[in-house]
């Protein structure tokens, strides 16, 4: 009764709405139906951007290979929408997915997703990041709207340490072979190619969102050369686009394992 009374006043209504949006959004229990009877939860206010890119703009539609997927690794899973989208395309074939995500906010949502009865038998969640395992952990900058990164944008940003996963942890958590590894952790694409040869050698396709400022230092051409050295060839790519919020370019490439 008190809440109903307070919402009559614009000031209190705005304060309550603000608190729900930023602190209790998941309590609203919002989910959106996608294809073939699957649903995508919207656990936080900033999840709509990722949902829009994948389900409305069909960001991955024209770049993924035309195969049936059995086992994948989703590196930089965000809220798990890539995996949900891929599963919704093949409703009669269960998709086993290892969701790797460094963000504290996203990992809470992914853990809830993995408990969902529709996904509980096929999703595994791992809180961690891709990097040089010799360093054990790295700084991570939490930002809303898919802007989290291992790179600092300003000296005022706060950070926290995230565990770097090694190859054996990934292989034991989700045994190979893999039909696809998708990597979308800003700046970690180079580390994936340099420090996880046993993992990617047992993968049929690599789907990488590249960033021209990756830690290798020489942009997309360096990534392409590294893929060639690892016996992968580029089979599809998106057009490069100017990055949002910083200088540089971004794009996606699909690479096929020639030894697979």
State where each predicted segment sits.
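Phosphate/nucleotide-binding beta-alpha loop and adjacent structural elements of enzyme active sites
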Residues: 1-260
